[in-house]
């Protein structure tokens, strides 16, 4: 059972960006909107992100960096932070997953898991 002081829940919605994609060049653009909810008992700051992006051919790309879209938000208990970003893949389908490193008000660092989610061109999956 995880510690109730450090409970971060992450949800993601995705969208295929046809206007920014170039299928003839194997470039498929997607946006994703992430909502990070602090269901814990302590305020927590998002320090960094770690994404694992796997395309439909099994190629894996890892992305690490400080914060999200230039921010390191402080999220109070019961509050949330939402942001949008994007990625380009060489295939019509792929999966993203990862984690955020968080810093609780009491100084404890912990990871918030980002469960795998699918990126797919509409109609690409049957």
From Swiss-Prot:
Signal peptide: none annotated. InterPro entries: ApaG_domain, ApaG_sf, Uncharacterised_ApaG. Residues 2-126 form the ApaG domain. One of its GO terms (biological process) is error-free translesion synthesis. This is Protein ApaG. NCBIfam families: PRK05461.1 (NF003967). SUPFAM superfamilies: ApaG-like. Pfam families: DUF525. It comes from the Bacteria. PROSITE patterns: APAG. The gene is apaG.
